[in-house]
Amino acid sequence: MSPQTETKASVGFKAGVKDYKLTYYTPEYQTKDTDILAAFRVTPQPGVPPEEAGAAVAAESSTGTWTTVWTDGLTSLDRYKGRCYHIEPVAGEENQFIAYVAYPLDLFEEGSVTNMFTSIVGNVFGFKALRALRLEDLRVPPAYSKTFQGPPHGIQVERDKLNKYGRPLLGCTIKPKLGLSAKNYGRAVYECLRGGLDFTKDDENVNSQPFMRWRDRFVFCAEAIYKAQAETGEIKGHYLNATAGTCEEMIKRAVFARELGVPIVMHDYLTGGFTANTSLAHYCRDNGLLLHIHRAMHAVIDRQKNHGIHFRVLAKALRMSGGDHIHAGTVVGKLEGERDITLGFVDLLRDDFIEKDRSRGIYFTQDWVSLPGVLPVASGGIHVWHMPALTEIFGDDSVLQFGGGTLGHPWGNAPGAVANRVALEACVQARNEGRDLAREGNEIIREASKWSPELAAACEVWKEIKFEFPAMDTL
């Protein structure tokens, strides 16, 4: 008989409860290139040793349960169990540890973010022996990432589709986010695109409400896109939110967007779920649609420093599940986002190979091989005075999205769009000439406003607006 299935009825098995660390804490283990590696921030209950806490995480997120079971003898735990292979204290924190866990690749279904998360962050987060638990990072091996399609198109293909190079893309979320009729909504889209923006956007909670049904919105937005393209000679788009109550309805909306000939649709990937998101990403690649991703609900999961899932993990999961854009914070706007941490997961979204760098919160070297990259979207409380910093922080491969910073212009939507486009072009030109955007940014904007009355008006309106609060999530 195979040693995996051999049992001895006369001996039976030793029933009862035993410490997790006896089986799942293996500091001598050498990780394999095919292992999925996880870094957990563990806060044990008083009296629980860190080795037992780390082993409990490895056990409960893989093959373990609370007691010994006779069916353990029917398989090879050494082959399938998760292993806590290293534990280190968190500097400056009492009774917090980083527990490193290795998972064999055979534990996970190919091409399924849903299955990966169900194992790694499933029941274990409610484990009583832990006061708190946070998944800080994952190392996804090429052997697993290659089972995913990833983004429908990626950064280079998107630039080729839009014929836009050498600068960040400009967007705008239509406001008020709820309450407009479809025709008035389309009018706002047209004015913003005509003024110089590349994209406009449905807000995350715009789906198909009584005041504006999705089909009407799609039709009027498509009309706005075609009219703005004819006037400007540029390719334009609007993120039509296909998020719906069922996957079938979501795909139906994406099909209608394709029939209208628009370039991009949108999905709320956390509230919609990874299964729905992956299905939509596959449809988008097959049918030539770009896919914009909103991260609504992320702060419920990632904002607390000692419990939940860090956004860098959610960003990696999105790259695997599929999306061409994803909101990534602004550093300088109204939403949470510390600079080094933000730049860490921005690199994880865009680059092919990212070295371990604990100063930016990156616990593992990540090799994406040929998986396409995702454009980070900076959105939330930003305006023209932020343009130099945003251009310097995010670089060309990004989308800078101004909602109130466009629609709040005193002269209207189109002048607001003009102001943002002029500010962006001025910053890109100054950077290309070798000027320091971080040091000379305000002067660059003032110089540009001398020949752009739209920019001058925007500068006056938002000269005193700041969002200066300490970040909750720090290294």
From Swiss-Prot:
Pfam family, one: RuBisCO_large_N
PROSITE patterns (UniProt xref): RUBISCO_LARGE
Catalytic residues (positions): K175 (proton acceptor), H294 (proton acceptor)
Keywords from the UniProt entry: Acetylation, Calvin cycle, Carbon dioxide fixation, Chloroplast, Disulfide bond, Lyase, Magnesium, Metal-binding, Methylation, Monooxygenase, Oxidoreductase, Photorespiration, Photosynthesis, Plastid
Catalytic activity annotation: 2 (2R)-3-phosphoglycerate + 2 H(+) = D-ribulose 1,5-bisphosphate + CO2 + H2O; D-ribulose 1,5-bisphosphate + O2 = 2-phosphoglycolate + (2R)-3-phosphoglycerate + 2 H(+)
Site (Transition state stabilizer): K334
Annotated substrate binding sites: N123, T173, K177, R295, H327, S379
Cofactor, free-text remark: Binds 1 Mg(2+) ion per subunit.
GO molecular function, one term: monooxygenase activity
GO cellular component: chloroplast
The protein's required cofactors: Mg(2+)
Positions carrying N6,N6,N6-trimethyllysine: K14
InterPro entries cross-referenced by the UniProt entry: RuBisCO, RuBisCo_large_chain_AS, RuBisCO_lsu_C, RuBisCO_lsu_C_sf, RuBisCO_lsu_fd_N, RuBisCO_lsu_N_sf, RuBisCO_lsuI
EC number: 4.1.1.39
PTM-bearing positions, type N-acetylproline: P3
Positions bearing N6-carboxylysine: K201
Metal-binding found in the keyword field: yes
Oxidoreductase is among the record's keywords: yes
PTM comment text: The disulfide bond which can form in the large chain dimeric partners within the hexadecamer appears to be associated with oxidative stress and protein turnover.
Location of the protein in the cell: Plastid, Chloroplast
Chain's role: RuBisCO catalyzes two reactions: the carboxylation of D-ribulose 1,5-bisphosphate, the primary event in carbon dioxide fixation, as well as the oxidative fragmentation of the pentose substrate in the photorespiration process. Both reactions occur simultaneously and in competition at the same active site.
NCBIfam families linked: PRK04208.1
Record's miscellaneous remark: The basic functional RuBisCO is composed of a large chain homodimer in a 'head-to-tail' conformation. In form I RuBisCO this homodimer is arranged in a barrel-like tetramer with the small subunits forming a tetrameric 'cap' on each end of the 'barrel'.
Family under the similarity heading: Belongs to the RuBisCO large chain family. Type I subfamily.
Protein name: Ribulose bisphosphate carboxylase large chain
